[in-house]
Structures are given as C-alpha cells and as structure tokens.
C-alpha cells in the first residue's frame, strides 16, 4: 500500500496531548506525544479509507509573536 507524509500539529491540554493533521482535518489525542501521533495516524488512515483525497498540499507553518494583555 502506498504511503504519504502528513503533518501533525500538537498542543497540550491539561494531561493530554491533542494532535491534528491539517491536510486532512483529523484530530486525536493521547497521554504522550507518541500516543497522540499514533492515534492520529490511525484516525487519518481510517478517514482516508472512506474519503480518499485527490491530492494533498503541504501546509505552510509559520510562527508569529503577538502582544498578550492581562
């Protein structure tokens, strides 16, 4: 089966890590970063079985600074 590289964007919420695949829109979570990515991989593969993507473009990821008041 052919494979494709996707992006995982992670952030921590309390005691869980949330992982999102921006190319597909799938989201999953885990107690560790590794578990969150493994769960995201599984969710993405299951999603793509039902809804194949015609083509996937890599997202542009940028970091920016913003003023925070409070």
Regions found by a protein language model. Give the residues of each.
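Short aromatic-glycine-(Arg/Gly/Cys) micro-motifs in beta-strand/loop hairpins
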Residues: 4, 9-23
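A short, exposed loop/beta-hairpin motif centered on an aromatic-Gly-Thr core
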Residues: 24-33
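Flexible, active-site-adjacent loop/turn segments at secondary-structure boundaries
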Residues: 22-25, 46
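Short, charged, surface-exposed hinge/linker loops at domain edges
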Residues: 1-5, 9, 35-70
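Short histidine-centered beta-strand/loop micro-motifs
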Residues: 19, 29-30, 56
């Amino acid at each position: 089966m052919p494979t494709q590289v996707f992006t995982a964007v992670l952030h921590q919420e309390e005691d869980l890590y949330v992982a999102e695949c921006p190319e597909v829109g799938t989201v999953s979570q885990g107690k560790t970063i590794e578990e969150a990515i493994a769960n995201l991989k599984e969710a993405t593969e299951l999603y793509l079985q039902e809804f194949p993507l015609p083509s996937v473009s890599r997202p542009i990821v940028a970091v920016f600074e913003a003023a925070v008041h409070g």
